[in-house]
Amino acid sequence: MQVKQGVYAIKGVVQHYDWGGTDFIPALLGQVNAAKKPYAEYWMGSHPKSPSELITETGNWSLADRVQLPFLFKVLDVSDMLSIQVHPTKAAAALEFARENSEKIPLDSPKRNYKDENHKPELAYALSEFWLLHGFKPEHELLAILRAVPEFAGLHDWFLREGYLGLYKKVMGMPQDEVNTLLQPLLDRIVPLYEKGVLHRQEEDYWAARAAITFNRNGQCDRGIFSVYFFNIVKLEPGEAIFQDAGIPHAYLFGQCMELMANSDNVLRGGLTSKHIDVKELMKHVRCEPLEPKKLPGAWISGAEKVFETPAPDFQLSELRLNAGGEEQAFISQGPEIWFNLSGSTRFFCQERELTVQKGEAAYVEPGMAYTLLSATGSRLFKAGLPHSTKGE
């Protein structure tokens, strides 16, 4: 481990969360999933929960023993809806983490909100048609949906008086019996339509019915269903990306994506979950304001590399497409990098060494390395690294 190889093969870790699909990630990794176990996420990074394995000439090591990366790189296959989430700013995370430590709340407690001192901005890049909730609807759209749903007549008037914060605070703090009284008649109308296949993914009713089937138990309606109507429903086409900054409520609904985020576990949930919801903490950090979703098309910085820039200093995503038998592509890693090979076969040349990375495999490149990539088959890769402004800091 003393001599730098420059570039290493790494092996990530699969997370078998219940919401994951059963086919996409196993096929990508070349694994047989005869038991149809959910393969939700494939993690690449040094996160202490599931660090990647670093494969070296002298043996295999935990990547976390070699480097503490500021980012975590993932492949996601979303088959069932994820919880509504909000992440704190970096400053808020540091304060709240210290507070919960002083209160001696165990890190593994289900009531622990802040697992570390970091923020958790996220970038999702669609590998398929990808659906998500992202921020509150613009005012005219939210008013229109509150008018269109008969059960929300009282919420329409409340929103006119109290605005976004008042509306969200009302439904998140509402007694469960009142939640059931409002939502159950709505669900009684729309769930049969969903089961008949007459609803469509661009409709709020589609996702509300799906959420009810997934999350409602013992006659209790999940209050996150309100947010399906309040938030923007966003469809990403393959190749489009979207950025989730601190405070923006969001939930992944369906599809496959690459996800790149700051290395943090700080999540405040707002429904569509059986896990702990701390409404008081959620309301501290959620941005209750209209948001026009901004899809990121990326920008080509060379004939082969497309970069997706965000305000986050922790990471930057690049997509690389290599033509079969094409010219070598040269890079200098001024920060740590992880490459994931989505398709084809790619050869890395660094420090007079060669590493071949096949479909579903990944490589770690150390900072300060000059290296080139070449593909005989044609390949498509994604690189997790640092933005130009923070490289080398």
Positions of predicted regions on the chain:
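Short histidine-centered beta-strand/loop micro-motifs
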Residues: 32-36, 84, 309, 327-333
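C-terminal, non-catalytic macromolecule-binding modules
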Residues: 256-307
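A short beta-strand-loop-beta hairpin characteristic of the jelly-roll/cupin
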Residues: 52-69, 135-136, 218-237, 331-334, ...
